[in-house]
């Protein structure tokens, strides 16, 4: 078992060394505000304003669900207002035996 594990580790390291990049891009200083247009490191990768479909001009509708805090009810709502209305106007069953004992 140990020989197999050692062999696997050696093989993993050999493959990892072969796949490692040969040239590294020099990192800029953290407080550097200048961005050079011919610098590969500054022009590659995602930007802060890059949002996939949104940057392509498509409208992205964000969906968020709101849940009733009562675990027995567990209904979902599209808006916070619907959830608040449900909580204010619904008699909920108790969440647990502990809640029944405290009443």
Swiss-Prot record:
Signal peptide: 1-19
UniProt KW keywords: Host nucleus, Metal-binding, Secreted, Signal, Transcription, Transcription regulation, Virulence, Zinc, Zinc-finger
Family matches, as InterPro entries: Znf_C2H2_type
Domain of life from the UniProt record: Eukaryota
Zinc finger C2H2-type: from-to: 66-92
Main location group: secreted
Subcellular location per the Swiss-Prot or TrEMBL entry: Secreted; Host nucleus
Keyword Transcription regulation: yes
SS bonds (residue pairs): none
GO molecular function: zinc ion binding
Region of interest (Disordered), ranges: 82-103
Single GO cellular component term: extracellular region
Function: Probable secreted effector that translocates into the nuclei of host cells to reprogram the expression of targeted genes by binding on effector binding elements in rice.
Protein name: Host transcription reprogramming factor 6
Species per Swiss-Prot/TrEMBL record: Pyricularia oryzae (strain 70-15 / ATCC MYA-4617 / FGSC 8958) (Rice blast fungus)
């Amino acid at each position: 078992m140990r020989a197999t594990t050692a062999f696997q580790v050696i093989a993993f390291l050999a493959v990892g060394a072969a796949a490692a990049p040969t040239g590294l891009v020099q990192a800029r200083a953290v407080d550097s505000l200048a961005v050079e247009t011919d610098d590969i490191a500054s022009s590659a990768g995602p930007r802060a304003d890059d949002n996939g479909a949104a940057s392509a001009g498509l409208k992205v509708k964000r969906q968020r669900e709101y849940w009733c805090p009562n675990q027995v009810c567990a209904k979902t709502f599209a808006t916070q207002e619907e959830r608040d209305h449900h909580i204010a106007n619904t008699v909920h069953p108790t969440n647990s035996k502990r809640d029944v004992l405290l009443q």
